[in-house]
Amino acid sequence: MARGMNHVYLIGALARDPELRYTGNGMAVFEATVAGEDRVIGNDGRERNLPWYHRVSILGKPAEWQAERNLKGGDAVVVEGTLEYRQWEAPEGGKRSAVNVKALRMEQLGTQPELIQDAGGGVRMSGAMNEVLVLGNVTRDPEIRYTPAGDAVLSLSIAVNENYQDRQGQRQEKVHYIDATLWRDLAENMKELRKGDPVMIMGRLVNEGWTDKDGNKRNSTRVEATRVEALARGAGNANSGYAAATPAAPRTQTASSAARPTSGGYQSQPSRAANTGSRSGGLDIDQGLDDFPPEEDDLPF
């Protein structure tokens, strides 16, 4: 399995006041919703502002230190973090999973940018930054499909490995399962990827909200790819073999991309606004908060 790479960079506003809470085992958890708008050029040449809301968490002592800084809703921050995959048993039965942002660092900006008032009572930052870079192995053979308008779309799921030491000093490995969506030429150019292939994906982090068959509101997080690099098999492997996975398939989206080859890979520009579950009418990230696990007690830090 390729040695994983997992980076998230956000610049946005705190949509509301952050919160500090404690798990049943006494672990501090600092939680904030960082919100902004991405400015993208569509396939038709028009500029669009795509709103996003991402839940960000800091754990342990750093959470308490962050809380002491007394950040409040409307403050602009820069976040450096990683995508964190969690899976747990749902109270109603069955397994549930979620991907959210684990912040490694959060700093307040020295200037106050333009804020957009949200009808739901929060704010988001105009001209924000939302960048993701992940490297891992494809977990299953992707299938290309086409929208009624003829746009190609490819859904990829990759396994990103993370090595760390637990509280007892033992070396551990954890795998994060990340879903990504590729559009148009980018999808066509990457349709030959196969299970186990190492791949690097760059893009923007988006949320998608939907209602399940039981009427419950759900939320998922994925990467909308802007550039993908297929890597040589065996390069940068931390060990031999492949970690199989069966994460839930991503939902259908409504965005597209125009792509061009760059340095052996392909880079794309998103066009029409994606169904991110973050409409400008409110703090829609709240719709799927039940998708997040209630405790972080099993985390190693």
From Swiss-Prot:
KW Cytoplasm (keyword) present: yes
Domain of life: Bacteria
A GO MF label: enzyme activator activity
Entry keywords, A to Z: Cytoplasm, DNA damage, DNA recombination, DNA repair, DNA replication, DNA-binding, Repeat
Induction (record text): Constitutively expressed, highly up-regulated following ionizing radiation for at least 12 hours (at protein level).
Bias kind Acidic residues: ranges: 287-301
Signal peptide residue numbers: none
GO cellular component terms attached to this protein's record: cytoplasm; nucleoid
Domain called SSB: residue spans: 5-110, 129-232
Knockout-associated phenotype: Essential, it cannot be knocked out. As SSB levels are depleted growth slows, tolerance to ionizing radiation and UV light decreases rapidly. Cannot be complemented by ddrB.
CDD domains named among the record's database cross-references: SSB_OBF
Subcellular location: Cytoplasm
GO terms (BP aspect): DNA recombination; DNA repair; DNA replication
Residue interval(s) of motif Important for interaction with partner proteins: 296-301
Coiled-coil region(s): none
One Pfam family recorded for the sequence: SSB
Keyword Repeat attached: yes
Location (main, coarse): cytoplasm
Region Disordered, residue ranges: 238-301
Subunit and partners: Homodimer. Binds ssDNA. Interacts with DdrB.
Known function: Plays an important role in DNA replication, recombination and repair. Binds to ssDNA and to an array of partner proteins to recruit them to their sites of action during DNA metabolism. Essential for ionizing radiation resistance. Stimulates the 5'-3' DNA helicase activity of RecD-like helicase. Stimulates RecA protein-promoted DNA three-strand exchange reactions in vitro with both D.radiodurans and E.coli-derived RecA. Complements an ssb deletion in E.coli, but does not complement a ddrb disruption in D.radiodurans.
Protein name: Single-stranded DNA-binding protein
Taxonomic classification: Bacteria, Thermotogati, Deinococcota, Deinococci, Deinococcales
